[in-house]
Amino acid sequence: MFCVIYRSAKRDQTYLYVEKKDDFSRVPEELMKSFGTPQLAMVLPLDERKKLANADIEKVKLALQEQGFYLQVPPPVENLLNTPV
């Protein structure tokens, strides 16, 4: 299984994973509007990998099979002023 990863033109650290290059047919239209023009980041063979840098590989595979896409959003920003020392 391969996946194609696109970077969002509108949202920092937001990535869209799809099964085929330039095939966004299963991605909801509203998501595509808020995502902006997809910028190709990379193509990955998922069968040969055990983990991904910032996403659970099993969740990615399942989402690709069931929904046809996986959306990776950045983690929430931590306010260091509120962190106890």
Swiss-Prot record:
Residues annotated as domain YcgL: 1-85
PANTHER family assigned to the protein according to its UniProt record, in alphabetical order: PROTEIN YCGL (PTHR38109:SF1)
Name listed for the protein in its UniProt record: YcgL domain-containing protein PC1_1941
Organism this protein belongs to: Pectobacterium carotovorum subsp. carotovorum (strain PC1)
Classification via PROSITE patterns: YCGL (PS51648)
Alphabetized Pfam families for the sequence: YcgL (PF05166)
Domain of life: Bacteria
